[in-house]
Each structure stands twice: as C-alpha cells, then as structure tokens.
C-alpha cells in the first residue's frame, strides 16, 4: 500500500491455531531418523525445546523479522513477505539476497523492489483530481483510493470486499495477491490492517498468518492435541519426544504420539495400511478370493463355480473351487471334476501366499490394537487407583507412601505405548538373529506388563496390603527395566545397522 506505516498488524488482534489455505503450509514431512543410542543417553533437559502460546509465537515472528532487517534494512512488511517466501529460514533468505540479482530476487518473492520507487505513480496520484477504480470503475478522489507498489489502485470498498473474500472464504493469509487481473504482487500485512475494518476478518487474518508461520517453520510445530493452541519450538529438528503444556506427548518430527522404537516413516506406512485394510480385512478373508490372473478380489454371490473376472483388462474365466482355468472343465458348470491338479495347485499356492500375508498383518494389527484399546482405559485406571490410594491411607499409610500406585500406572501406560509401537516395528522387520532377541525382549516386557496390570486391578484389603504393595513395586521396577532394555537394543540395532525391512 502507498504508506510508510511499518507497524505490525498483530498489535491489537488475537492469534490462534487454525488451518491455513496458503501455499507451503503442508507438513514438512521430515525424513530423519531417531537419535543414536549415544544421543539418547543425553539428558532430555539438554534438548531445550519451548512450548509457546500464540502471543509468544507472534513475538517470535517479530524477532525473526527484526533480526533479518538488521542486515536487509527493508520495510518490515516486505521483510515479512520475503521470510514467508523462504519458509522463515533467515539464513537462506540472507544468502539469496546477497548472492542473487536484486530485481530477480524480489520478483521471485512477488514483491516490488523497494529500491526502485515508483515515483511516477506517486506523482500521477498527487496531480490527479479523480481516479478510476479498476474494479467498479467509479471516479473517486485519490484519498478514497489505495494500491500497492505495482501501481494498481482500487477504491476502499472494493479492497475491503476483495480482502475479506480472500481471507474468510478462501482461507488465504500471506499469499493474497493484488486484485488486478494477472498481477502476482503480494498484499502485505500493513495494507490489510489499513483496509480491513471488520474485526472478525482481522482476527481470522492474524490466525492464518500465525498458522502459516508455524507450519512453514521447521523448528516449530503445533501441538496435535484437540483444541490445543500451543506450539513447540525446538533448537534443531529431529524425532524427539516433546511434552506440551496441555499434557500431550508427541514426536516433534511427525506430530504423532511418541512412538519409540519405530521410526516415523514406518509408522506413517502402518497408519495408512491400517486405514486402508483393517475395517474389511476379516470379512475379505472369509468371503472372497483373488482372481488367479490379476489378483482382483472377487466375491462369490451365487452357487455357480464358473467365475468371470470383472476387471476389464483381465476377463479371466476360472473355477471357484480349484482356481484353475475354466476351459478344461467342459460343461460341468456346478461341480469341479478336474483330475490334473498341477495348474490348480499353482493357483492355490498364490492364493495361500496372499492369505498368509493377510494373516501376518492381522497378527500384528490385533496386538497393536489391543494395547491401544488398553491405553484408552487410562483415565478409568487412574480413577480406580486414586480410590485405592484413598483406601490405603485409611489403613494408616501416608500420602507419600501410597504414591507407588500412581507411579505404577504411569509405568504401565508407558510400557503399553512402547509395546504398541513394537508391533509396528516388528511387522516391517525381516527375521534374523537380532530380531529374535527383540521378540524375546518384547515377550518378556508384555508378560510383565500384563502381570502389573493384573496386580493393579486387585482389591486391596488390610490383610493383603503389604503383599500387594511389594508385588506392585517389584513388578513396575521390572517393567521399567525391561522397557529400557528393549528400547536400548532396538536403538543399538539402528546404530549398527542390524535391522532389515520387508518393504
């Protein structure tokens, strides 16, 4: 806009975590590995991440702009657009700025080079008695018009309507371009602040540019918990366990619940596979077969054994009973009378391979889901344990003495979460000597975890109080130790490249 006002738009509006329609707001999809065993020994306090409120996010955004401008010395709105273009990577922006052709640099970022001031436009507008709005074609005095450095000018009502539509209806923030047809110059935040008077639209705009800032910045991530408005800021980006102020614990790299020992890329594949397969896999296994030629799944909906594949590129005719070609069956439409089983055996072997693959998937899926379902009872279990703690205090035990129960539930939930993700890890793992050691560790931890769960569900009486306390303490310490052993072994395997994968 034709204005020297560089004040930040966000001074008087709230900010928040909402989805943005701007380009470049997709997840950065970090493809990095879990830290090495040596790195994991480092105390978690050494990974100095911060949990930021939306106001702190806005302040952090200002700080980055100010730091960049110490060298750029550009108008603040221009610097904001440039930083957004470079995904808020200040170093990359400065490198390109000082290395590239200046005009080309600003052109790629869709801003006018501020060093090439459009004096002609300013002189034209100052001499004119009236100007024509390029949208509604009204003749208005210059002070009723506004425009960007590209020279396209529109009346205030047209600007307001245009910007409101882009912000509210289309969900655009940092990537709103000039209203002139074919002009790709971006509208800066100061222009929006001066032209948009509707408080609802202003708040929405600030939410969008704040969200864009977080999603573009590889050192920031919104907490994925429902309705949480916090973001986590990290010193460097890698798969790390971060704990939001809302209580949610997640992996910074992918945003999923913390999933040690499985890596982000395998968890992503697993979640997609579960979404695609789990709801219908059991029914498919019981009621369908695959075409022996193209493997398309076919349901038998009548008594006839003569099957015709509906795949337009296949049209294979085969026998439902033996899966062999239908042609040698002659006119025997209802009963398979083939004597030579060679071809049928080949077809059945292929069918069995597919069934075996499905059975393997269901083995790991069912155990994964079992631990997930158990974890969903966490709140109920905490409530039950709280009641037990109160009962124990009635048996002359102090508040401090009964804290072992809460500690036990914490470790139980931690072990269940670890076990849940070990089945994802195991599903993609090829068999070797180290994988057998892993499975032994997994079995040992699972057995101990189930026993701890059983202890916590027992009724507590004055007669068994001492016995239950000793058993719970011994078992949760054992679970904690075995969980640590399992994770250490898996990460040692990552470091020494023991693990090979099926896909």
UniProtKB/Swiss-Prot annotation:
Sites where the protein binds Zn(2+) 5: 291, 294, 309, 314
Region (Disordered) residue spans: 1-40
Residue positions binding Zn(2+) 3: 223, 228, 244, 246
Tissue: Widely expressed, with prominent levels in the nervous system and female gonads.
Gene ablation phenotype (knockout): Pharate pupae lethal. Larval muscles exhibit an increase in nuclear clustering.
Mutation effect (residue 150 to Y): In ari1-2; lethal phenotype and loss of interaction with Ubc10
SUPFAM superfamilies xrefs: RING/U-box (SSF57850)
Bias kind Acidic residues: ranges: 1-11
Residues where Zn(2+) 1 binds: 133, 136, 155, 158
Top-level enzyme category: transferase
Zn finger region (IBR-type): 203-264
Residues given in the record as Zn(2+) 2 binding sites: 150, 152, 178, 183
Active site: 304
Keyword NAD carried by entry: no
Zinc finger RING-type: from-to: 133-183, 291-322
UniProt-annotated stretches for the region TRIAD supradomain: 129-340
Known outcome of mutating residue 309 to Y: In ari1-3; lethal phenotype and no loss of interaction with Ubc10
GO molecular function, one term: ubiquitin conjugating enzyme binding
One annotated Gene Ontology cellular component of this protein: cytosol
UniProt keyword Transferase, yes or no: yes
PANTHER family on file: RBR FAMILY RING FINGER AND IBR DOMAIN-CONTAINING (PTHR11685)
Quaternary organization: Can form homodimers. Interacts (via RING-type 1 zinc finger) with Ubc10. Interacts with the LINC complex member koi. Interacts with park. Interacts with ari-2. Specifically interacts with isoform ECR-A of EcR.
Record's protein name: E3 ubiquitin-protein ligase ariadne-1
Source organism: Drosophila melanogaster (Fruit fly)
